UniProtKB/Swiss-Prot annotation:
The keyword Cell inner membrane applies. The keyword Cell inner membrane applies. This is Putative membrane protein insertion efficiency factor. Its main location: membrane.
């Protein structure tokens, strides 16, 4: 499952994101880099949950800033 999600993420980063204006993320690391790290660190299920929470925060009412992937416990 994780490999498929990483493949979809790669497709998004190289083909869809440039059409949307490229790097406009208000966070560091960018949301797509965060997603890749979350999937590699936590696997598919928890990684998807972390990605979902990050995307919800990525909106005009949030200042953004440094938001790393939490470490595994």
């Amino acid at each position: 499952m994780t490999r498929i999600l990483l493949l979809l993420l790669t497709f998004y980063r190289y083909f869809i994101s440039p059409l949307l204006g490229g790097n406009n993320c208000r966070f560091y690391p960018t949301c797509s880099k965060y997603a890749k790290e979350a999937l590699n660190t936590h696997g598919g299920i928890k990684g998807l949950w972390l990605i979902f929470k990050r995307i919800i925060k990525c909106q005009p009412l949030c200042d953004g800033g440094y938001d790393p992937v939490p470490p595994t416990k």
